């Protein structure tokens, strides 16, 4: 018997697709369950495989205790909501302001609400399919629906999503660790030293911290890291809201061509500190002055609107500081993939469901409603206030945008440190299921081997580092993974599994028609987004010096 598989699930009619009937009421033959569990081929699997099968939410309990799906869940409603919220929240929140800048406020809100609602509907389909299909494992549902191709499709989608998450975390290390070091050393700008090079730093962190943690057989700190990561993101959103009211618009002395602060190597650099309500920090802009002229401006240009503090604002500043409500450009194509990437939690829904106390589909759907709604509010706040801080100059990784405004700021430094610690500790957690899936696929029924354990981890980390070093910006990770694997996990696979496995509803029923429309919508989203992103790569090639 496969673990977490519902061998004896009845398929009695269930008129309410979110029925409150507990899934465990459907079991028969419970007297043989302990014997079946002990005879399971998975009973002797290594601890890492046990953790993967439940995605880390079952702690240190033996797999045999969970081999049958009739076991009662022990996780409270509140903790299940917290676990799912943490599964949703990730690095995608850092790219939402960029998405808003390239869609406009109103269009972004419409898209955000749409993706959130579709994610909830996807969870509904997944929970219904899990009961009818008799399994709480995503890959197993794929195998039951479409055989080996379905299993491989689910495996590839989940693995790609995890690799994308790993890469985005390493990108954050690449972006933010140099800024933290620069702040601690009191440097006003990146001097180009090796210890300020993000490519070197991400390699050092990967080899010195991430790889050793990935070699552990169990990740006992998982629970602590989950809570810490979510707390970091709440702190991040709070600081983004607070800083919006400190950053002036337009930003002083911006170069008219590229929107960056102008530096002139032939002129001395002076620091302008604008008034700030914070007692511990100021908003610092690096300015060049020659005879009190702003950087890069000649005598004729100085005739422009120069303020008494020597800071010149752009002539078109008022227009640049007006929020846009509808925007369409080549980068708008990244919006839906970024949102899809931010809302993916579906591989974690089933393990959390399996551990929910007094579980039922209705109760798990309520958990999903609360978690996704809470993340929706956080995403909207982060995107809106991040966008209103920088408008069109916002970057694809929001934290990095503050680097051109602040040379040093205590609150931002704390956010950067917290986020860096969180993502560094999260990378090994994401790596574990990737490695276990690869081992299960390539070396089925083989005993645990430290050589495979180490070698596969090293290869995965090496490939992700190469990806992070070669790919110029995190938006390509958000865009490609969001358009491919995230769309598969949210739209295509749940709908396809539902159409194939739920037999009691006729093909022309409203439920099946809705699932079919959902499937077609997902395919259109994936193909359209991928096509637009590829066109953007062709006609707007990335700047190799980006970041």
Swiss-Prot record:
Glycans are attached at residues 260, 264, 276. Disruption phenotype: Heterozygous mice pups for SLC38A4 die shortly after birth, and only 28% of pups survive to 2 weeks. Heterozygous mice pups have a significantly reduced body and placental weight when the allele is paternally inherited while mice exhibit normal body and placental weight when the allele is inherited maternally. It catalyses: L-alanine(in) + Na(+)(in) = L-alanine(out) + Na(+)(out); L-methionine(in) + Na(+)(in) = L-methionine(out) + Na(+)(out); L-asparagine(in) + Na(+)(in) = L-asparagine(out) + Na(+)(out); L-threonine(in) + Na(+)(in) = L-threonine(out) + Na(+)(out). GO terms for cellular component: microvillus membrane. The disulfide bond plays an important role in substrate transport, but has no effect on trafficking to the cell surface. Keywords: Amino-acid transport, Cell membrane, Cell projection, Disulfide bond, Glycoprotein, Ion transport, Membrane, Phosphoprotein, Sodium, Sodium transport, Symport, Transmembrane, Transmembrane helix, Transport. It comes from the Eukaryota. GO terms for biological process: L-alanine import across plasma membrane; L-alanine transmembrane transport; L-arginine transmembrane transport; neutral amino acid transport. Residues 126-151, 217-220, 354-369, 433-453, 498-514 are cytoplasmic. Changing residue 345 to A: No significant effect on alanine uptake. Does not affect alanine transport activity. Symporter that cotransports neutral amino acids and sodium ions from the extraccellular to the intracellular side of the cell membrane. The transport is electrogenic, pH dependent and partially tolerates substitution of Na(+) by Li(+). Preferentially transports smaller amino acids, such as glycine, L-alanine, L-serine, L-asparagine and L-threonine, followed by L-cysteine, L-histidine, L-proline and L-glutamine and L-methionine. Imprinted gene expressed from the paternal allele in blastocysts. This is Sodium-coupled neutral amino acid transporter 4. It comes from Mus musculus. The lineage of its organism: Eukaryota, Metazoa, Chordata, Craniata, Vertebrata. The gene is Slc38a4.
């Amino acid at each position: 018997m496969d673990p977490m598989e519902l061998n004896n699930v009845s398929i009695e009619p269930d008129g309410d697709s979110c029925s409150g009937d507990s899934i465990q009421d459907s079991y028969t033959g419970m007297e043989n369950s302990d014997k079946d569990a002990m005879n399971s081929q998975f009973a002797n699997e290594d601890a890492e495989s046990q953790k993967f099968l439940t995605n880390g939410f079952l702690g240190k309990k033996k797999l045999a205790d969970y081999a049958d799906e009739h076991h009662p869940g022990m996780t409270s409603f509140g903790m299940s909501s917290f676990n799912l919220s943490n599964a949703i929240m990730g690095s995608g929140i850092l790219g939402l302001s960029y998405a808003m800048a390239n869609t406009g406020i109103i269009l972004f809100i419409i898209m955000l609400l749409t993706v959130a609602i579709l994610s909830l509907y996807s969870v509904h389909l997944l929970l219904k399919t899990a009961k009818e299909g008799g399994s709480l494992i995503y890959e197993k549902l794929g195998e039951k629906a479409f055989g080996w191709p379905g299993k491989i499709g689910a495996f590839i989608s989940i693995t790609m999503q995890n690799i994308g998450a790993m890469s985005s975390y390493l990108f954050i290390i690449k972006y933010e660790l140099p800024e933290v070091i620069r702040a601690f050393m009191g440097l006003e700008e990146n001097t180009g030293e090796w210890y300020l090079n993000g490519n070197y730093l991400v390699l050092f962190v990967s080899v010195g911290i991430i790889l050793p943690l990935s070699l552990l057989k169990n990740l006992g700190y998982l629970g602590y890291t989950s809570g810490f990561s979510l707390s970091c993101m709440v702190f991040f959103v709070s600081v983004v809201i607070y800083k919006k009211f400190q950053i002036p618009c337009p930003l002083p002395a911006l170069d008219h061509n590229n929107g960056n602060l102008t530096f002139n190597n032939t002129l001395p650099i002076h620091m302008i500190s604008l008034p700030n309500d914070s007692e511990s920090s100021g908003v610092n802009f690096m300015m060049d002055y020659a005879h009190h002229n702003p950087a890069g401006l000649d005598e004729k240009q100085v005739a422009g609107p120069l303020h008494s503090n020597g800071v010149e604002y752009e002539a078109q500043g008022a227009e640049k500081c007006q929020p846009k409500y509808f925007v369409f450009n080549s980068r708008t194509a990244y919006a839906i993939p970024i949102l899809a990437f931010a809302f993916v939690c579906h591989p974690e829904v089933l393990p959390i469901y399996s551990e929910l106390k007094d579980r039922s589909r209705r109760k798990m759907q309520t958990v999903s409603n609360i978690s996704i709604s809470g993340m929706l509010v956080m995403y909207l706040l982060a995107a809106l206030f991040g966008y209103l801080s920088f408008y069109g100059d916002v970057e694809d990784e929001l934290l990095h945008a503050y680097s051109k405004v602040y040379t040093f700021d205590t609150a931002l430094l704390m956010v950067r440190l917290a986020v860096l610690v969180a993502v560094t500790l999260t990378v090994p957690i994401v790596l574990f299921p990737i490695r276990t899936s690869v081992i299960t696929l390539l070396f089925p029924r083989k005993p645990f081997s430290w050589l495979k354990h180490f070698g596969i981890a090293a290869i995965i980390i090496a490939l992700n580092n190469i990806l992070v070093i070669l790919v110029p910006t995190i938006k390509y990770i958000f865009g490609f993974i969001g358009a491919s694997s995230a769309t598969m996990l949210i739209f295509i696979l749940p709908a396809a599994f539902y159409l194939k496995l739920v037999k009691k509803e006729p093909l022309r029923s409203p439920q099946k028609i809705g699932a079919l429309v959902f499937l077609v919508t997902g395919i259109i989203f994936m193909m359209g987004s991928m096509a637009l992103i590829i066109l953007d790569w062709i006609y707007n090639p990335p700047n190799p010096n980006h970041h």
